[in-house]
Amino acid sequence: MKKRVFSTALISMFVLQSVPVFAAEYEATAYDVEVADALKVPFSGSAEGYFEGGLVTGFGSAVTFRGYDAEGNPQFYAVTDRGPNADAPRYDRNGTTNEAKIFPCPDFVPSIGVVTVTSEGARVSEAITLKDAQGNEISGLPLEAGLIGSTGEKALDMEMNEIGYDADGLDTEGIAVDADGNFWLCDEYGPFLVKVDADGTLLEKYAPGDGLPEILQYRIPNRGFEGLTITPSGTVLASVQSVLDVNGETQKTACFTRIVALDPVTKETKMYAYPVDLSQYSSPANCKIGDIYAIDDHTLLLIEQGKLADGTMSNRIYRVDLSTAEDISNLTYEGSALEYAPAEALQDIGFAQKELLLDLRAYGWTAEKAEGICMTDKGEIVVINDNDFGIVTVTTDANGVDTDITDYVYNAETKTFSKDGVAEQVSVSIGENTEPAQIWIFREKTQEPAVYISVRQAALMAAEAGNPVSIAFDSASDTVHLTSGETYAATGTQVEQQPLASVGSVSAWRLILDGNEVDIPVYHVNGYTYVEQAELEAATGWKLA
């Protein structure tokens, strides 16, 4: 097991809505997530001989705090997505072409794992499989065309054969635990919300038009609900991963994505608009929500990520305020969905307000996707990444040159590949994605207590550090003048003035060094002049022992 420690200060941040900026300094520890052999996914289809012992199950689609084990180690519930899947060619049957995905392990069952973090690393040693209401294990296979939640994809095996659909299939993402100990999960297909008991058996399911607002059916395929959390008062919140694509017309112009609130008792829903900064992304659809976590009834932590307009990847955590956000459930624009509205037409609508809290990449984060976020009872921020079970599609052409499988069309009748209408020989296998699965814990740095020293003592300390200065007090102008290169000699009680941990209010006096004012507060305590040591060091460059 491995862990790594990163530390940095937040120096710059941008604010997309008019809110105060919240800044903090954190230390991050990253733990590689190991999975017990018994929980790995059996697989032997790699031509290169990877994955001896099976695929490492990807418990990285969401995370929530569970508590502590008997040794005091923190534990978390983490959820998989639909299971191992990889890019595939477009699939043509009888002249109809569909998008497709390769499911090398079609029997995989989406699961909830228990992650234990120790000083040595993180490990998943137990898991709960998800089941339908009758207790049958579900799969992560897509839904058939025509059903709410269908992505239009064909599910294929390694030989490009169709392997069918699952009307109960789930692509699970967010996770939270309610007051009764039940799990709530969200799904990217539908989007769906599901409530399962502690054993993983389905209790309730919500879909667009069946417990959820119908407009959610316009999610971009495979971009349904990506984040879920439960507020302290019990409201279930779920975030759509990207902007809606209403009638296939709004994914390139919409200015916001939606956060849905469900009252699990009354079944009433509300929707809030989370703003997308169109100046940051070349397309609004490139902005993706990774997960959400409720700090209180109206404040969230939210992962926003995606490829920026300059081509770089971004993974950021925002603090989101819903207290003044307006319920947009019944709002339209010129008789159509609100997604059709240009930004200037939305100025009077109360969007969620957001402020940058953490830029993950400033701490050394390199994974493409941060997909889970929560907090511990100690206020630590926990983030988990999804490495897609550590697999990728490997494609080579007839000359043995690596190529991109998504550039090809596979014809189900002739069992041949083509590219740009020209038949080609292609070899397809599953390779290793070496991106590690990790869980990161961010702890806010504790501030060292302030130390206040008298100006006279500061002069003595400066001299010892090789920066001699003299002192002159001018009560007429309320100034203390320090002159570099001149030695200050103290006598008597001046030497005995001790550092203080606290002082009174700021005085009117000012500190002048070589004719220039030093912009730090000056205090008077028992007739002596004091300054904060750290502030003096920062302003002068001195290192005072």
Whereabouts are the PLM-identified features?
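Primary recognition of N-terminal secretory signal peptides and signal-anchoring hydrophobic helices
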Residues: 449-545
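Sequence/structural signature of beta-propeller domains
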Residues: 24-451
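Sec-dependent N-terminal signal peptides of Gram-positive bacterial secreted proteins and lipoproteins
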Residues: 3-23
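A general lysine-centric signal
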Residues: 2-3, 195
